[in-house]
Amino acid sequence: MHHILLKALASGLIMSLFPYAAISAPPKPAQTDSLLTLLPKTPDAADRGRIYVQLADLSGDSLELAAPYWEAALAEAHKAGDTYGCKDALDFLVRKFADRDTRRAEKYIALSDSILPGSRHALFRSSLYAYYLWKQMNDNSIETVTRALEELKGKNYDRLTPEERIEWEFLTGLAIDFSSVTTEAYDNIAKAIPYVERALENLRKYPLEERLHLEKICHDELSDLYMLCKDKRAEEQIGQCIDLHRKWLAMDDRFERPHRDTTGYMMRAYAKMVYLRDLISRDKLNEYYQKCIGLARARGDMAEIYSTSARYYQCTGDYERAVAYIDSTITVYKSKGIKADLAPIYATQSYLYEEMGDYKN
């Protein structure tokens, strides 16, 4: 049970116990209207793509508003031959819909084959599928995972391209991780590590712009595996994720994006650091907690503040404050209509009450 809870608590940067809900600045109608009036007067695909991206950035956390803009930005980027724009849009859409609308996510993954064909983009295409499957495993979507594993077993490794072999290594490690946790064969978790490590080793032979997305997913999964195996290298892996995120942002020199969300990923990465518990010093735990909370406050994200504070005080042994923050987290989720599986949240809260000797709650 402990391993299942820990896996749920630290399932990559998408926390299933306390799912992030970045509550940043709301959409800005005046700026949005101004950009919308420019569209009919803008025939150039690159310029239209810029407008759609800026509209998406202005949509705040409303996926309902942002998704159509990202789809339009993808179409214009494809017309303009804007590789960064295509990758940015596809990555956003797959990540957002992987656990919300699997068929839609699968559509974007299939679309990447025609929009970004060839070996040069093979690793990026693999990253979309890897992330999608990774999310399905974290969400315990048995049917999807079983189908993917059957396909994986049917592949002849010797006949795979170098890029396909990297994908095979990662997915094999992911499969071992998934089956170990779901069958409670926790001693087998460590067997997944060499596969993901080999995937990373082989990825380093490729240019950064080709490998970046898949490499980030590999580091994220490896951080989970190290964490579950009580390996202190987990911290370094999360740090690599943050570094790659920053490098991806730095690659975008097409136009200014003042409303781009540049901090959400790092906020969640620092939140994940809190789960390292005994693997890092108390000073580092405090440092990562403060970094996460600082970003969350700047974004006005009360859900992240409460949920990460609950984790932090649980880690530091202040169970009374941890329980109080869990209560606040649940209240925010309900008031904001945030979808969350409350069962593991209540299970954690119950565990903390038991640790405090409060058996009435």
What are the functions of these language-model segments?
Residues 1-7:
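Positively charged n-region of N-terminal signal peptides that target proteins for export
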Residues 8-20:
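Bacterial N-terminal signal peptides
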Residues 22-361:
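A "functional boundary" signal
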